Curated annotation (Swiss-Prot):
GO molecular function: magnesium ion binding; prenyltransferase activity
Protein name per UniProt: Isoprenyl transferase
Main function: Catalyzes the condensation of isopentenyl diphosphate (IPP) with allylic pyrophosphates generating different type of terpenoids.
EC class (word): transferase
Source species: Thermotoga maritima (strain ATCC 43589 / DSM 3109 / JCM 10099 / NBRC 100826 / MSB8)
Co-factor requirement: Mg(2+)
Keyword Secreted appears in the UniProt entry: no
Gene field: uppS
Known EC number: 2.5.1.-
Length: 233
């Protein structure tokens, strides 16, 4: 089975999962964090080099204040809880997103986990937090304009533009998985997903299993990736 180098996941459906069970939405987020923990282990078993998890979008600030505060706390708790696994399995963590507007406890944990895991090289776990694809592109344009205004000469190509993205050295996702039955990217990795293969599950994220993950990987391994060209020239 051909294994993708980079898998990205839109972990959707936590709130609906909780609602269906008559539980507070935060219970869905807690269960979702457990499934992410499992997905990291499955990815390690398969030899996947990069795993990106869409955890908190720039649009999620519109949610109720109590839920947003819980998600901030959950980020900190999740990093603390996973440190043993990260060290043991040599998993590097990088955060993809904007620091503006985040509470100090989140910024501190962001810096801490990136620093503590920066030398690990078995797999890179990328947590998209306070992230929006359009905002990333706009930020890149602003950085380019700033450099030009300071006298830097820039030949604008796809590759030079890429250098202004949040994590320019991370390869584009080979496969993007989305749960919950929604069939859209929802402002996720808009630049990087140009040639990504997509796989959609009707299941809600807290119900996602290893069998589901393997099914998506198997589907990917059977696809022919043309990148706009032809397979045989």
């Amino acid at each position: 089975m051909r294994i993708p180098q980079h898998v990205a996941i839109i972990m959707d459906g936590n709130g609906r999962w909780a609602k269906k069970r008559g539980l507070p939405r935060i219970k869905g987020h807690q269960r979702g964090a457990e499934v992410l923990h499992n997905t990291v282990k499955w990815s390690l078993e398969l030899g996947i080099k990069y795993l990106t998890a869409f955890s908190f979008s720039t649009e999620n600030w519109k949610r109720p204040k109590e839920e947003v505060e819980f998600l901030m706390d959950l980020f900190v708790q999740m990093i603390d809880r996973e440190m043993e696994l990260l060290r043991r399995e040599r998993v590097r963590v990088r955060i993809l997103g904007r620091k503006e507007g985040l509470p100090e406890k989140v910024l501190k944990k962001w810096q801490e986990v990136e620093e503590k895991t920066k030398e690990f090289d078995r797999m890179t776990l990328i947590i998209a937090f306070n992230y929006g694809g359009r905002r990333e592109i706009l930020d890149a344009v602003e950085f380019i304009l700033k450099d030009v205004s300071h006298g830097k000469k820039i030949e604008l190509t796809e590759e030079t533009f890429r250098q202004y993205l949040y994590l320019p050295d991370v390869p584009d996702p080979d496969l993007i998985i989305r749960t919950s039955g929604e069939m859209r990217l929802s402002n996720f990795l808009l630049w990087q997903s140009a040639y990504s293969e997509l796989y959609f599950f009707k299941k809600l994220w807290p119900d996602f299993t290893k069998r589901d993950f393997l099914r998506a990987i198997e589907s990917y391994s059977k696809r022919e990736r043309r990148f706009g060209g032809l397979i045989n020239g």
